[in-house]
Amino acid sequence: MNSQAWIQLAVFLALLMLLAWPLGRWLAAVAEGHLPQGLAPFCRVETALYRAAGIDAAVGMGWKAYALALLAFNALGALAVYALQRLQGGLPLNPQGLPGVGADSSLNTAVSFVSNTNWQGYAGETTMSYLTQMLALGVQNFLSAATGIAVAFALIRGFAARSSSAIGNFWVDVTRITVYVLLPLSLVFAVFLVSQGVIQNVQPYQDVSTLEGAASTPQTLAMGPVASQEAIKMIGTNGGGFFNANSAHPYENPTPLSNFAQMLAIFLIPAGLVFAFGRLVGDVRQGGALLAAMTVMFVLAVVTVTSLEQRGHPQLAALGVDPVASALQAGGNMEGKEARFGIAASALFAAITTAASCGAVNAMHDSFMPLGGAVPLLLIQLGEVVFGGVGSGLYGMLVFAILAVFIAGLMIGRTPEYLGKKIEPYEMKMTAVVILVTPLLALLGTAVALTAPTGPAGMGNPGPHGYTEILYALSSAANNNGSAFAGLSANTPFYNLLLAVAMWFGRFGVIVPVLAIAGSLAAKKRLPVTAGTLPTHGPLFVVLLIGAVLLVGLLNYVPALALGPVVEHLMQAAAR
């Protein structure tokens, strides 16, 4: 890494912590329902909504009722998104006259946006009408993010509660998160994006002449309400682009400043939730330990991917091409990257979007060096707990914290405890389910895709790189990331259905056992700290937590990674 990359990383982390701390205080207030008096008019509107829907906001839910409400809410959301896509040809706000989307693609997209994955097998500018973008995809960008944060709130309440049968009210949580967190942040961020040149309109596509004049063919420029969707796309760690090029498109991400702000937006709520966690459990040091573990793993990932991309292709270096960055060139591997961002900003964006469950891209991960592309892939496969998605990153890391204290308990022969709650067989069974669901979906799905006749047909490249494209797709879907090695032609009935299954169970097959853990912990008494209690706020626990995350990730995925990016790297090195 050069000095520019180090400075960029340092400024990014400093601004992130500066912004996440006050947001954490606000998130804690929203979780507890302690809203300031100045919001009384909004609170009255909120109360009216509950009354109209027949919801008693004062009644808490057990984990089973919470889970059923969540599943029903998201299932209805998926049906609505599916129907809007199928019917868009006869609906308004469709100036290009785009027809209804096919059944398999509609199903894939509905599951994708409801599960906060935002995998896109289609090109937005040639497939989706403005109404579908706004009413189907845009709405789910808010609701899927609110669902993830609600689950995180429920798990935090499980740790903080004392002999309680309730973990909150799902309908209240989703409403408050949407109204008091996601909407205000998105509104402010959308205005900023418009100031940077992100478009926001409902005009028909524009035909323009290029600089060549009459000798050239007119070019069609896609229009649309981009800024409003771009804001929640980042803040909600959704990642689904309005355009096919996602955040590499100048209408989505026009300037280096907008690029930096989008990176901050991705991590803002995940980092804020860690601070909120410390406040809600009554010990800010607990949140600090989780934050330290996340930051260490994130910095290691950024340094690795940036260094590998800056080094460039070894065969080009052998031909005398200068790979060193200078005032006149970016150096390194610029394939698939935007000149206005360069290697450092592209590598940092790649690490951020895959550490979080965002999946937005400002460069093509498929064009990264073999080991450079392995870094974002591994970040996805670790379960996206390095800050992670909104809500999902925190509850995923808390599951690993439970695993870490269990391992420590085995080493010292003591019943494990975390935040005063005994970790017993039921919690460990649910923890095992959470940890094993996504690797099972990713690896089994990859095996199915490789052995089915229609699976390898979608590979854009032969050999280990084509295999990595499939592994990346299934890992991304199962872990609800949504980014891709885009050389894979995935908009086929086979991949649309396979990836939809991975996305649905990768999301809700994790959420349900997490809520079960929350319900079990909430019912327990909170034990006092004794001399035999493992401190979970110091550097020793941070190291133990990092070890648990890396150990599980490596044991699950290293054999699969060895067949893809590692083999490709060795083949590339041997060809010098």
Swiss-Prot record:
**What is this entry's stated membrane topology?**
Multi-pass membrane protein
Domain of life per record: Bacteria
List the transmembrane segments: 4-24, 65-85, 136-156, 179-199, 257-277, 288-308, 341-361, 371-391, 393-413, 430-450, 497-517, 540-560
Q: Which UniProt keywords apply?
A: Cell inner membrane, Cell membrane, Ion transport, Membrane, Potassium, Potassium transport, Transmembrane, Transmembrane helix, Transport
- Major subcellular site: membrane
Cellular location of this protein? Answer: Cell inner membrane
Q: Does the keyword Transport apply?
A: yes
| Gene Ontology molecular function | P-type potassium transmembrane transporter activity; potassium ion binding
Q: Does the keyword Ion transport apply?
A: yes
- One GO CC term, this protein: plasma membrane
Q: Name the InterPro entries on file.
A: KdpA (IPR004623)
Similarity comment: Belongs to the KdpA family.
Quaternary structure? Answer: The system is composed of three essential subunits: KdpA, KdpB and KdpC.
Function field: Part of the high-affinity ATP-driven potassium transport (or Kdp) system, which catalyzes the hydrolysis of ATP coupled with the electrogenic transport of potassium into the cytoplasm. This subunit binds the periplasmic potassium ions and delivers the ions to the membrane domain of KdpB through an intramembrane tunnel.
Could you tell me what this protein is called?
Potassium-transporting ATPase potassium-binding subunit
